[in-house]
Amino acid sequence: MKIGLKYKNEEHIFDECISAGVPFLKYPILEKEGLVEHGISTRLGGVSEGFLGSMNLSYTRGDDPAHVDENYRRMAAAIGVKPEHMVCTHQTHTTNVRIVTREDAGKGVTREKDYTDVDGLITNVPGICLVTFYADCVPLLFLDPVKKVVASSHSGWRGTVNRMGQVTVEKMQKEFGCDPKNILACVGPSICQECYEVSSDVAEEFQKAFAGMNGTETLLYQKPEQKAEGKYQLDLWLANQLWLTDAGITPEHLEVTNVCTAHNPAYLFSHRKTNGKRGNLGAFLCLKENGTAGSRQRNGIVWQGKSRW
């Protein structure tokens, strides 16, 4: 049973999963290592109502907190983690990345956060689930299967122009001795270039940031009717791919999304598509407490219409 998402191409980047009645996405590139539980939520399978329906994961968009609590419980059951072990970002479009310890467990879900301005999280603690939020911005997920370190970062246009993906990789190197050549990196569901119009000042920031870098020819383009207004179409997927490659991530270890949030309003939240009337999607990433290469998933997950075993 497939969720029904529209894809930009035929590449197999994601597996569509349903567990405990909750649809979500997984990356085969991460799953095959047998080291993590992970998933990216859709807007389906929760209890929130109206434009927040139904799997809203934000406590700050006017939802009933009891609904959000239940949504977290459902996501936790679906991907195999515990709400009290989740740790959430406090996203303000920075490039600040926090090292998460066992003492942080539950922050943002079962207890208050004691930090602000954090758009990325890194941990090497098994059982701690990193949670980041999106509704057009770019999810970035990382796994070093050698050092057994995971990271999750939020990269909107501000984070992207300021190299959020690269900053995260550098933090993994500095704090945990990770080698970029070993790191698996995933660029998640977010708004595609076709749907993402930006102003000339944003375009200029990207032109400056990527000046002299190869592979940027299609990063920005203008439709004929946009020239008078100084508007451009920006490719956040390519921008993040370029930063990650520049950080040392190898092509065979990098997966770039082919799912656009704005093209899938029935299944994913999109800020642009709904003029801000939306909930938040979540990306969940957790080192297994007994993770070993090649370990199997729990029963009950359906993968693109076929039972995993």
Predicted regions and their residues:
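Active-site microenvironment for binding and transforming phosphate-containing groups
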Residues: 1-309
